[in-house]
From Swiss-Prot:
A GO molecular-function annotation: D-xylose 1-dehydrogenase (NADP+) activity
Annotated keywords: NADP, Oxidoreductase
Organism annotation: Xenopus laevis (African clawed frog)
Protein family: Belongs to the Gfo/Idh/MocA family.
Name assigned to this protein: Trans-1,2-dihydrobenzene-1,2-diol dehydrogenase
Residue ranges crossing the lipid bilayer per the database entry: none
């Protein structure tokens, strides 16, 4: 039986997710419906991607009995309300990052998923890339000894994009792209809570963070330094430094195709497509989609790789960092 997907929102990320699904076997994954707040946009998206049903409201999608799981690709500030509505209608949900605007909302969604006994996962697609799988394996094997220091950065000049700078749209470097650095460290340190969070940065004229650096300190004298900006391109690398070596992602840390371990590089190709894509290595979203299918087939209500506890920890760290910078969302 195919996993039947409903797509919530017709933005750029939803386009790439649907294209990524098309690289997987049709016997396993089918997109059966799409919803936008504008019916014409939904119809247009459905026509482009050969989706049978188009809805002019998210509520209709949430109530569609043919859907197994809903992918939420809408803007950040509506995540909480849309995901809650889907959960209340008994739908499994894969929601784009950030899962919600703050940790209180994340806890609310986790509680709702448990109450209604449905699957919920934050769509940090990075975690399902072969590079990330390789990193988890290397860490479990203590390939670089004890991890003492992590560096991660994600910067890209998107300061002209309203979604990235407007406070009402949930803009800002940390919520939009810096969150990938936070999830990376959270993965490496197995969801452990940092002993301290120190953030410094600069605010955009709109009041969101345009540049932010965070120092996380963990027990056992372990440290992570994360940097993110929407004002300039960064090398977008990561480094995990241990007592016996170093693991590096040389570029595209959020959707990587290569990893360097003690100077030796290994490459992994993402699925191929001829369809137009908006995001680098976007077909790699197929990895998270297949993971969701496997979780559902096993009857799981959360992912063992991108757990709800991790989502809560990521949101908690970001809350603390944004508070220190004085970023307040409506």
């Amino acid at each position: 039986m195919a996993t039947k997907w409903g797509i919530c929102s017709t933005g750029r990320i939803s386009n790439d997710f649907v294209v990524a699904l098309s690289t997987l076997p049709a016997v396993d994954h089918q997109v059966v419906a799409v919803a936008a707040r504008d019916l014409e946009k939904a119809k247009n998206f459905a026509q482009i991607h050969n989706i049978p049903k188009a809805y002019g409201s998210y509520e209709e999608l949430a109530k569609d009995p043919d859907i197994d799981v809903i992918y939420v690709g809408a803007i950040h500030p509506v995540h909480r309300d849309v995901v809650l509505m889907c959960l209340q209608n008994g739908k499994n949900v894969l929601c784009e990052k950030p899962l919600a605007m703050n940790s209180a909302q994340v806890r609310e969604l986790i509680a709702a998923a448990r109450k209604f006994n449905v699957f919920l996962m934050e769509a940090f697609w990075s975690r399902f890339f072969p590079v990330y799988e390789e990193i988890r394996t290397l860490l479990s094997q203590k390939a670089i000894g004890d991890v003492k220091f992590i560096r991660a950065e994600f910067g890209t000049p998107i300061y002209t994009v309203p979604r990235a700078v407007e406070k009402e749209l949930g803009g800002g470097a940390l919520l939009d792209i810096g969150c990938y650095c936070v999830q990376f460290v959270t993965m490496v340190f197995n969801g452990e809570k940092p002993e301290s969070v120190t953030a410094r940065g600069f605010l955009h004229e709109t009041g969101v963070d345009e540049t932010i650096s965070i120092i996380l300190e963990y027990s056992g004298k372990r440290q992570a330094i994360l940097s993110s900006t929407i004002m300039a391109a960064l090398p977008n690398q990561t480094a995990i430094c241990g007592t016996k070596g170093i693991i590096q992602i040389p570029s595209f840390m959020w959707s990587p195709t290569s990893v360097i371990v003690n100077g030796k590089e290994t490459k992994f190709d993402v699925p191929h497509t001829t369809e137009p894509m908006n995001f680098s290595n976007g077909t790699g979203m197929s990895y998270e989609a297949e993971h969701v299918r496997q979780c559902l087939l096993k009857g799981l209500k959360e992912s063992p790789i991108m757990s709800l506890a991790d989502s809560e920890m990521i949101a908690t760290i970001m809350d603390e960092a944004l508070e220190q910078l004085g970023v307040m969302y409506p």
